[in-house]
Curated annotation (Swiss-Prot):
Signal peptide: none annotated. Its EC number is 6.1.1.19. A motif ('HIGH' region) lies at residues 121-131. It comes from Streptococcus pyogenes serotype M3 (strain ATCC BAA-595 / MGAS315). It is found in: Cytoplasm. This is Arginine--tRNA ligase. GO terms for molecular function: arginine-tRNA ligase activity; ATP binding. GO terms for biological process: arginyl-tRNA aminoacylation. The keyword Lyase does not apply.
Length: 563
């Protein structure tokens, strides 16, 4: 139990008028540490108890069990709590040393599934930095949900269907070179895609021809299907090479095409419930009662189905297949209206489990303030970017530690980790401007900075030849140690907040805070001095490294032992 929860529970025992959660939210940290570690303002009880806040604080301070604290005193209208730092540090260190990487493991999920729709790049298009956000946010949330006791199911809902395949088939038949595509599939397909889109802007017949080829594809035309399958296979080979570099795996690659034969059932269900309304020849579902002005367009006047029809089929399939406790869609915030419609249509169909679906939206990645666009050829491709990040990391490692063993593996961990961490430390609803130099820096709020703090601690532990014993009591009460202890103790709550808010930036900021606190401690404390505090300080180092490594793992970032 963290100290804030402990204090809230002790106050709740003597204040039945307030719920423990309400007390927890009222607790404050005094500006001056001489006034205690946490304080409870009695103002909120004045009306209920019909007493002055000062009197309430004085009376309650007398009633609270002080055995858990150094002291409890009333100061004006506040009850100030002074924590027993030695006792708490001993408990926290024991918990981390005993549990190791399982420290802060929770059982909220009880093994239930969480479906995570993530990454989902478009076939025959390059994997760009724009796809990175969905990939790394989804991967981090999968780790977080597992830490909360859920079983994550990572779904790569590939963009392997749609009019763009009509465009690509037209382009390939006009200008395609089979040998060139086989040699450099994504590069060649991207060139074809950009070229055909440029031509379509001045020649309206291109769109008509593309629509015709896509209709053939929908009807199972042999030539169209073979080309589509080839584009898909070549793209997946390239994507999987990148996923291997990012250390990201999936449980399902069922993309849009997988649901082609599952949409008729959706239409039948909607018709059976009389939810479909004709509008200008199209079939729609009205959602005004959900505060959604525009109806959900299910079927166009030419009989073609839309994304939402496919997503309805996917939602039904996932619920039946995984019986998820939560289903999250890690998709850009420009799709917010689509997901509101999706949930509302499912609700109209009578599926209350739609309440368990969440659109985990995120902002755009820009370059020099400009929006990225595959169609216009303005992209930052991930593969060369990862290679450049690894090279930059290797240069810095060579300068800092030229005799390091496994330099290539460490450079990979640092370079890839730098890109992931920079993305994840940003509040997901905010975008960020891509800056590789800032990402790979060992200074500032970066992945390499946190990784280096972990490696520094491992170096200290190796030098001291120290391994903590689960049967030894370690304890610290100095101010510098206390800042670290408080953060380590807060780790379980940070994990839960990250999970509840679908917000990996909470975890990334925690990792930065812990690394900064340790570096400050390292600068002011002679850790290896041979005195009575040496083992206590080393135990703190061990616990800090354990939690730093686990925080990075939950972000999908490796923590090398040497850098």
């Amino acid at each position: 139990m963290d100290t804030k929860t402990l204090i809230a529970s002790e106050i709740a025992k003597v204040v039945p008028e307030l719920e423990q959660d309400a007390i927890f939210n009222l607790l404050e940290t005094p500006k001056n540490s001489d006034m205690g570690d946490l304080a409870f303002p009695a103002f909120s009880l004045a009306k209920v108890l019909r007493k002055a806040p000062q009197m309430i604080a004085s009376e309650l301070a007398e009633q609270i069990d002080e055995s858990q604290f150094e002291k409890v005193v009333a100061v004006g209208p506040y009850i100030n709590f002074f924590l027993d730092k030695a006792k708490i540090s001993s408990q926290v260190l024991e918990q981390v040393i005993t549990a190791g990487s399982d420290y802060a493991q929770q059982d909220e999920g009880q093994g239930r599934n969480v479906a995570i729709d993530m990454s989902s790049p478009n076939i025959a298009k390059p994997f760009s930095i724009g796809h990175l956000r969905s990939t790394v946010i989804g991967d981090s949330l999968a780790h977080i949900f597992a830490k909360m006791g859920y079983k994550p199911v990572k779904i790569n809902h590939l963009g392997d269907w749609g009019k763009q395949f009509g465009m690509l088939i037209v382009a390939y038949k006009k200008w395609g070179d089979e040998a060139a595509v086989q040699a450099h599939p994504i590069d060649e397909l991207l060139k074809l895609y950009v070229r055909i889109n440029a031509e379509a802007e001045t020649d309206p017949t291109v769109d008509e021809e593309a629509r015709e080829w896509f209709r053939k594809l929908e009807d199972g035309d042999k030539e169209a299907t073979e080309l589509w399958q080839w584009f898909r296979d070549e793209s997946l080979l390239e994507f999987n090479r990148l996923y291997d570099q990012l250390h990201v795996t999936f449980d399902s690659y069922n993309g849009e095409a997988f649901y082609n034969d599952k949409m008729d059932e959706v239409l039948e269900l909607l018709e059976a419930k009389n939810l479909l309304v004709e509008s200008k020849g199209a079939q729609v579902v009205n959602l005004e009662k959900y505060g959604i002005e525009h109806p959900a367009l299910i079927k166009k006047s030419d009989g073609a189905t839309l994304y939402i029809t496919r997503d309805l089929a996917a939602a039904l399939y996932r619920k039946r297949t995984y019986d998820f406790a939560k289903s999250v869609y890690v998709v850009g915030n420009e799709q917010a209206a689509h997901f509101k419609q999706l949930k509302a249509v499912l609700k109209e169909m009578g599926y209350d489990w739609s309440d368990d679906m969440t659109h985990v939206a995120f902002g755009l990645v820009t370059k020099g303030g400009a929006k990225l666009s595959t169609r216009k050829g303005n992209v930052i491709l991930l593969e060369p970017t990862v290679a450049e990040a690894i090279n930059r990391a290797a240069s810095q490692i060579e300068a800092k530690n030229p005799n390091l063993a496994d330099k290539e593996a460490v450079a990979h961990a640092v370079g890839v980790g730098a890109i992931k961490f920079y993305d994840l430390k940003t509040d997901r609803m905010n975008g960020y401007d891509f800056d590789l130099e800032a990402m790979v820096s060992f200074e500032g709020e970066t992945g390499p900075y946190v990784q280096y703090a972990h490696a520094r601690i491992q170096s200290i532990l190796r030098k001291a030849d120290f391994t903590p014993s689960a049967t030894t009591t370690y304890s610290l009460a100095d101010a510098e140690s206390w800042e670290i202890i408080k953060l380590i103790q807060d780790f379980p709550r940070i994990i839960k907040r990250t999970s509840d808010n679908f917000e990996p930036s909470i975890m990334a900021k925690f990792a930065i805070n812990l690394a900064q606190s340790f570096n400050k401690y390292y600068a002011h404390t002679r850790i290896l001095d041979d005195n009575s505090e040496r083992d206590n300080r080393l135990a703190l180092c061990y616990a800090t490294a354990t939690v730093l490594k686990e925080a990075l793992r939950l972000l999908g970032v490796d923590a090398p032992n040497e850098m």
